[in-house]
C-alpha cells in the first residue's frame, strides 16, 4: 500500500455482515469507528483522493433490527471496531517499504480527539519511524512529535513507554535495560504509550 494517510477521501476496505440494522444507523456507526481506526493509520503521510471503507449488512441473521444504545448495538459496535482495527493495521503493515507496525496510544488527554491527534502525529513522524527501524529508543523524537501535535502539553506531565518499557517521565529520561529494549524493538510490531498527567 502507498498513499496511506486516510482522510476517507487509494485505500479500499470492505466488510460484510448478516445482521439486521438500519442503513442510517450503520452509516453513523461506521463514520464514528472510521475516525478511531482507518483515519488513525499512516504509511507515508500522503492522503489519497479515493479512500473508501464500505460495510454491507444484508439482515440475513434474522435478529431483531439493532437499535442505537442497546446491548445488541454495543456488542455489534465492539465487533465491528475489532474488524476495522484489524483491517486498518493490515493495510498499514502492507505499506510500501514498511518493516514494522508502530502503534501509539495516548491516555490522559483532555479529549479523545486530542489523544488521537497526538497518537497519529507520533506514528506519522519520519524521525520516530527511523528510530524504531534502527532499534533506537529515542524518546526525544517521540516527545518532539507530541510537542508539534497541535496539543498543549507540559513535558513535566508526560510519561512515555516504548515497547512496554518506561523511558521518560516527569520531564526526565529514565534508566532501562538496553538489552531488553533492543530485543523488543526487533519485533515486527512496536507500541508506544503516552500518558499525560
Language-model segment annotations:
Residues 1-197:
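A structural signal for small-residue-enriched, beta-sheet-centric alpha/beta enzyme cores
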